[in-house]
Amino acid sequence: MKKFICILLCVLMCAATVALVACDKKEETLKFGMGVHISASATDATADKEGQGKATINVAVITVDAEGKVVACQIDTADNTVKYTAEGKAVANDGFKTKYELGNDYNMVTYGGAAKEWFEQADAFESVVVGKTLDEIKALVAEGGKGTDAVINAGCTITVTEFVGAIEKAFANLADSNATASSTLKLGMSTEQSTADATEDKNGSNQVATTIVAAAIDAEGKVVAAANDCVQVKFTFDAAGVSTYDATKAAQSKRELGANYGMVAYGNAAKEWFEQADAFNALCVGKTVAEIVALCGADNYGTDEVKTAGCTILVDGFTKAADKLD
């Protein structure tokens, strides 16, 4: 009987030890990063056809483990096209949606003869990326910009060069975070347009500014990692609708511009745009999407909490993009 009791006690102690170890074991935290790949082009207006400026913004947000392998990936593209006439008049858009937001209305199946819609093909590419290193992801691009057999067989037959370009930048922007394998990656983009007609003395413009917010969100709906950026492309044209936009100059996001954005040098700001955007990012961590949206403030310059944190720029772009994380 004593022997049985001793054995039972040993078993119970071992079970308790295993339980304690299991309770103490925490999920591995991952690196988190967002990348933005931009391409822009412009055409002249003619008597028969409006000129147009097109800014294509591919965004990827990733989490990466200690071995440098992607744990999760989310991709979206803002294909912003604006127009102007041969009389130098800027044309206002009804609104802007990303390809993922358009869903079936992007019409790759109906009008393009594709087997799957864009969002389904993007999902397929994301699934291929998971578990791969950056070098392995770069190797997924085949001749002509489309994917390798592994990508095509997964259901992604569109070009993937820009996806990989965005992912490569996301790797370059990786930072330690509280994101884990159970976190959900979300991506939101909000685009605003501003226009000015051309005169004989001054070029007109049709500008699009796309604000991007990415986040890793936990099971309680709280942000555990956040990133943001803004891509502002100003398409210019003369009174005859001839494009004066320099497409040979690579478009850069505000973060990529860094100190060259010039808020301190030319705008007399205390901090550069990216520094103020970082301050807003820091406030997002620990908050729900609704709480982030509430940071906008009545004047769009942020609540007192935002201003005290060191962000004095307009934040309505951030909050509008964040609102799409739900």
Map each language-model feature to its residues.
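Positively charged n-region of N-terminal signal peptides that target proteins for export
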Residues: 1-9
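A general, composition-driven signal for non-globular sequence regions
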Residues: 7, 19, 187-189
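Active-site- and interface-proximal helix/loop "cap" or "latch" segments in soluble metabolic
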Residues: 26-326
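Sec-dependent signal peptide cleavage junction
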Residues: 15-30
